[in-house]
Curated annotation (Swiss-Prot):
The keyword NADP applies. InterPro entries: ADH-like_C, ADH-like_N, ADH_Zn_CS, CAD-like, GroES-like_sf, NAD(P)-bd_dom_sf, PKS_ER. This is Probable cinnamyl alcohol dehydrogenase 6. It comes from the Eukaryota. NADP(+) binds at residues 53, 171, 192-197, 215-220, 255, 279, 302-304. Involved in lignin biosynthesis. Catalyzes the final step specific for the production of lignin monomers. Catalyzes the NADPH-dependent reduction of coniferaldehyde, 5-hydroxyconiferaldehyde, sinapaldehyde, 4-coumaraldehyde and caffeyl aldehyde to their respective alcohols. Keywords: Lignin biosynthesis, Metal-binding, NADP, Oxidoreductase, Zinc. Binds 2 Zn(2+) ions per subunit. Zn(2+) 2 binds at C104, C107, C110, C118. Expressed in the primary and lateral roots, and root caps. Expressed in the hypocotyl, cotyledon veins and hydathodes. In stems, expressed in the vascular cambium, interfascicular cambium and developing xylem. Expressed in the style, anthers, stamen filaments, vascular tissues of sepals, stigmatic regions in flowers, and abscission and style regions of siliques.
């Protein structure tokens, strides 16, 4: 177990699991959280989902990791302390904390409720707070956050399965709304049936949208069609299937982070269709300009959502009974879970039971 030196006055001891280097191996870690500010809430972490980006950051695959690194940005918890100027929450409220915990609040993106695109947005973990301290994420017993960057969790939404909505859920909801891929007159393709993709199917169906899953894994067709309710399933490596579906989709949301060709996906789009990229692939894409010009097709990207939209998404999920398919794990299983995640061996999201299993790992 490790303890940070140079702890600031009025800080509060915290406990979690951290990686110390790019091996990505997590182990118990004692550190400090700042004192709760006037407009901040302290949140007792109950559950935290494991996002694929956690794995990327643990192993420094994006070359920006700051160690020690405590991951976790799919946080569900309970307000345990409030600052004297907090008006949004009360003690005991159930809340969610997603990928960002602050932004500049003055730029055009912030003024338009798109804090997620603020160039000075502060990540929930692996980011640097205004006071110069490193942010640690939700694989820990508590977290401090400005009330503006937490969302209310309705009592009708199961807490443990709500955790993945804070990243995977909003990542799918936002582009569907922004690019107009909602309603019975729309047909959306979702590439990849994993943590993001499976939630995307459920949001699409709740919007009344026709949805087709595109996957290289033939064995996922039954889950996509029978369990999640997708209207169609295409095997991306089956040339006949892909050819038959050409020009049928208004939009496609590509969740795959592994390197792959997007040219066949562009072929699935109708004229004026949009391919929206969510997966951060290591290698750049190689595409023909003619594949876009002939049909006025476009490629876009999307990343999570602003705080207002995240609350809207959570409320929509509660209203429509949308939840993630999860596997609940204990804190001491996290390294095994990371190994399984790297192999794609999860259906479809791991969630750590922080409140019931973290304390037992402290020696």
């Amino acid at each position: 177990m490790e303890r940070l030196s140079g702890e600031k006055e009025q800080s509060v001891e915290a406990f979690g699991w951290a990686a110390r280097d790019s091996s990505g191996h997590l182990s118990p870690f004692v550190f400090s959280r700042r004192k709760t500010g006037e407009e901040e809430v302290r949140v007792k972490v109950l559950y935290c989902g494991i996002c694929h980006s956690d794995l990327h950051c643990l192993k420094n695959e994006w070359h920006s990791s700051i160690y020690p690194l405590v991951p976790g940005h799919e946080i569900i918890g309970e307000v345990s302390e409030i600052g004297n100027k907090v008006s949004k929450f009360n003690l005991g409220d159930k809340v969610g904390v997603g990928c960002i915990v602050d932004s500049c609040r003055t730029c055009e993106s912030c003024r338009e409720d798109q804090e997620n695109y603020c160039t000075k947005a502060i990540a929930t973990y692996n980011g640097v707070h205004h006071d110069g301290t490193i942010n640690y994420g939700g694989y820990s017993d508590h977290i401090v956050v400005d009330e503006r960057y937490a969302v209310k969790i309705p009592h009708t939404l199961p807490l443990v399965s709500a955790a993945p909505l804070l990243c995977a859920g909003i990542s799918m909801y936002s582009p569907m709304k922004y690019f107009g891929l909602t309603g019975p007159d729309k047909h959306v393709g979702i590439v990849g049936l994993g943590g993001l993709g499976h939630i995307g199917v459920r949001f699409a169906k709740a919007f009344g949208t026709k949805v087709t899953v595109v996957s290289s894994t033939t064995g996922k067709s039954k889950d996509a069609l029978d369990t999640l309710g997708a209207d169609g399933f295409l095997v991306s490596t089956d040339e006949d299937q892909m050819k038959a579906a050409m020009g049928t989709m208004d939009g496609i949301i590509d969740t795959v982070s592994a390197s792959h060709s997007i040219s066949p996906l562009i072929g699935l789009l109708k004229s004026n269709g949009k391919l929206v990229l969510l997966g951060a692939t290591e290698k750049p894409f190689d595409i023909s300009a003619f594949s876009l010009i002939l049909g006025r097709k476009s490629i876009a990207g999307s990343g999570i959502g602003g705080m207002q939209e995240t609350q809207e998404m959570i409320d929509f999920a509660a209203e429509h009974g949308i939840k993630a398919e999860i596997e609940i794990i204990s804190m001491d299983y996290v390294n095994t879970a990371m190994d399984r995640l790297a192999k794609g061996d999860v259906r479809y999201r791991f969630v750590i039971d922080i409140s019931n299993t973290l304390a037992a790992t402290r020696s």
